[in-house]
């Protein structure tokens, strides 16, 4: 899918979208209502800009971290009060290289990031290892039926890359780890990092 050189940015603290991830969003601020109107009338794409965490409250001028994912608007329900509920699906990793402030919302000039694979056998093995870690460490954190549900989800994932980004979307919470994962080009390196993170949590 074609990714435009510029994408609207919805800046949020503690939030990161990965390829294949589906993120529900509630739009209520005036600037993001304007953004949504432009997105709907355009290519239906924008990205989540992760605000750098700090001890103070988040302000308009706070730093947006560079790595993100171009997202496609998959569903949108407009409410009578002018707010909206939508689903944004992650499409492709991007790096925000410049931010424009000439609209009510921020617009980022982005560079798409490719993923490389050097050893598919290692990737397949790492994917199986990651699935085992998820089942062993996370299946009982929500409810007793979670292991069965998680097994089915993992079984339905079509590729090792899908497995990695599913784990990243749902089980990586620290922004430094999310940014590092998005920044890595090589899929083997991404698996090494996420396995190291999740196996010690």
Give the location of each predicted region.
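N-terminal low-complexity, acidic/polar interaction/targeting segments
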Residues: 1-201
């Amino acid at each position: 899918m074609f990714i435009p050189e510029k994408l609207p940015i919805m800046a949020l603290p503690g939030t990161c979208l990965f390829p294949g991830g589906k993120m529900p969003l509630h739009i209520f601020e005036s600037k993001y209502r304007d953004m949504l109107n432009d997105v709907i009338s355009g290519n239906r794409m924008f990205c989540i800009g992760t605000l750098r965490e700090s001890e103070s409250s988040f302000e308009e001028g706070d730093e947006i971290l560079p790595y993100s994912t171009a997202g496609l608007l998959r569903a949108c329900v407009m409410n009578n009060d002018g707010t909206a509920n939508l689903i944004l699906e992650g499409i492709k990793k991007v790096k925000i290289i410049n931010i424009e402030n000439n609209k009510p919302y921020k617009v980022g000039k982005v560079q798409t990031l490719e993923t490389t694979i050097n050893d598919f056998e290692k990737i397949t093995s790492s994917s199986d290892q990651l699935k085992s870690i998820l089942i062993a460490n996370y299946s009982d954190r929500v409810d007793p039926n979670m292991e069965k549900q998680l097994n089915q989800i993992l079984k339905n994932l079509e590729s090792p890359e899908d497995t990695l980004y599913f784990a990243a979307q749902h089980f990586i919470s620290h922004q430094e780890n999310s940014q590092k994962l998005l920044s890595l080009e090589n899929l083997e390196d991404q698996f090494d990092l996420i396995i190291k993170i999740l196996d010690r949590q």
